[in-house]
From Swiss-Prot:
Composition skew (Polar residues), residue ranges: 77-104, 113-122
One GO CC annotation: nucleus
Principal location class: nucleus
Organism for this UniProt entry: Xenopus tropicalis (Western clawed frog)
UniProt protein name: UPF0688 protein C1orf174 homolog
Sorted UniProt keywords: Nucleus
Family from the record: Belongs to the UPF0688 family.
InterPro entries named in the record: UPF0688
Subcellular location as annotated: Nucleus
Stretches with biased composition (Basic and acidic residues): 47-63
A Pfam family it matches: UPF0688
Organism ancestry: Eukaryota, Metazoa, Chordata, Craniata, Vertebrata
Length: 227
């Protein structure tokens, strides 16, 4: 029974354990010696590839940047030219529009000008009158009228009455502005008494005689000087 137990459960001595450990270490050392240089070579190849890729990227970077800058400059120049063309066209259009508006305004002003009338002058005086509010006569205040005057309405309507609803006729001074010149008034009587025609003739002849006497006196003096 004891032999079977020993054959079934094999005992390992310390020597066998040491041998197995040394064999495992030698196998690991052999693997390290065989596969170590290969791994190092593969890692060095990978680092070289990565460095070459980086160099290529670094070389391509400035070239692409220069190309992008050139493209941006070309686009900016084209946009500036188009904007300048648009601005010039707009300025030309505005100039032509202003010229057309100026000619139209001048025509309208020439057509809408009305002859100045004394009634309008009176309205302007009444609207923009000067009133003296001080006792010394130095302070004048410029007043503007808010309501339209009746004279202007009458002048525009052309009716002979003051108001259309009333039957009161307009005074002659307003209807006929120069009524005094149109009337046949008697001649003005002078304050002093008028002289007769005889007196006027006598004065005329006396003046002539005095002139003749003066001429004779001057001729006599000239003759005496010659002698």
């Amino acid at each position: 029974m004891r032999k079977r137990k020993l054959s079934d459960g094999v005992r390992c001595s310390a020597r066998q354990k040491n041998r197995s450990c040394s064999g495992a270490q030698s196998s690991t050392d052999h693997e390290a010696d065989t596969y170590g240089p290969k791994k190092k070579a593969a890692s060095s190849n990978n680092t070289e590839k990565e460095s070459s890729k980086k160099l290529r990227k670094d070389e391509k970077g400035p070239v692409e940047a220069d190309e992008n800058e050139l493209l941006n400059k070309i686009d900016n120049a084209a946009s500036n030219e188009s904007s300048n063309v648009n601005d010039s066209q707009q300025s030309e259009k505005s100039i032509t529009n202003t010229k057309d508006n100026g000619t139209r305004c001048s025509k309208l002003r020439a057509n809408t000008r009305l002859p100045s009338s004394p009634v309008s002058d009176l309205n302007e005086v009444s609207c923009n009158g000067l009133t003296d509010d001080s006792g010394d006569g130095t302070g004048f205040i410029h007043k503007t009228c808010s309501e339209p005057s009746k004279l202007r309405e009458i002048y525009l309507n052309g009716s002979p009455f003051v108001d259309e609803d009333s039957n009161q006729p307009m005074p002659l001074g307003l209807f006929f502005e120069n009524a005094d010149l149109m009337q046949d008034l008697p001649p003005a009587v002078p304050s002093c008494a008028s002289m007769s025609r005889r007196e006027l003739r006598n004065l005329h002849f006396r003046a002539k005689e005095e002139d003749e006497d003066d001429d004779d006196y001057v001729d006599g003096l000239a003759n005496e000087g010659n002698i």
